[in-house]
């Protein structure tokens, strides 16, 4: 099952991504992780990306698409994969379709901006693993501690309100158009599209996702 997650920063994508990966046994594909792995492995695309990054430039969509294509061909993606945070723009989505990277199901988690601002200030992260908690909505078993390791949780600087609002502006400008884009792709029967109310509890959203994906 090839799944793509859409939603604003703070909509709860990280928590649902973790759930989907465990439930369906598929890897999450993050472009940042992919870039680092390709550079470390010294693949031709990795060396090309390193050259660009060392020069302080942005890695082109073409190069990223090449890396995604390489990544989804690996053995652990045989049962599918989860794309979160990519594509971010319509040109990237077009390039991905042109490269023959098909998506079976687009999952959108929808949350109003003001709710996101409120949520972010209560977010806590385990720096080692990236596991995300919330002091109200998704509490750790022990306050301030990671469930798995027992290590301290931290507040990320980009959970500050001004930063959150800036990120939401960028999301609405660049990524929100993908909602309409993939809605049209689904209308043409090339993928399935499901939208979920992300203001519900984490468990409710997870349950609805399972029903939609089954």
Curated annotation (Swiss-Prot):
PROSITE patterns: ADENYLATE_KINASE (PS00113). Its main location: cytoplasm. Residues 30-59 are annotated as: NMP. Keywords: ATP-binding, Cytoplasm, Kinase, Nucleotide biosynthesis, Nucleotide-binding, Transferase. Its EC number is 2.7.4.3. ATP binds at residues 10-15, 123, 132-133, 200. It catalyses: AMP + ATP = 2 ADP. GO terms for molecular function: adenylate kinase activity; ATP binding. One of its GO terms (biological process) is AMP salvage. AMP binds at residues 31, 36, 57-59, 85-88, 92, 156, 167. Residues 122-159 are annotated as: LID. Pathway: Purine metabolism; AMP biosynthesis via salvage pathway; AMP from ADP: step 1/1. It comes from the Bacteria. GO terms for cellular component: cytoplasm. InterPro entries: Adenyl_kin_sub, Adenylat/UMP-CMP_kin, Adenylat_kinase_CS, Adenylate_kinase_lid-dom, P-loop_NTPase. PANTHER family: NUCLEOTIDE KINASE. Consists of three domains, a large central CORE domain and two small peripheral domains, NMPbind and LID, which undergo movements during catalysis. The LID domain closes over the site of phosphoryl transfer upon ATP binding. Assembling and dissambling the active center during each catalytic cycle provides an effective means to prevent ATP hydrolysis. Belongs to the adenylate kinase family. Catalyzes the reversible transfer of the terminal phosphate group between ATP and AMP. Plays an important role in cellular energy homeostasis and in adenine nucleotide metabolism. Monomer. This is Adenylate kinase. The lineage of its organism: Bacteria, Pseudomonadati, Pseudomonadota, Gammaproteobacteria, Alteromonadales.
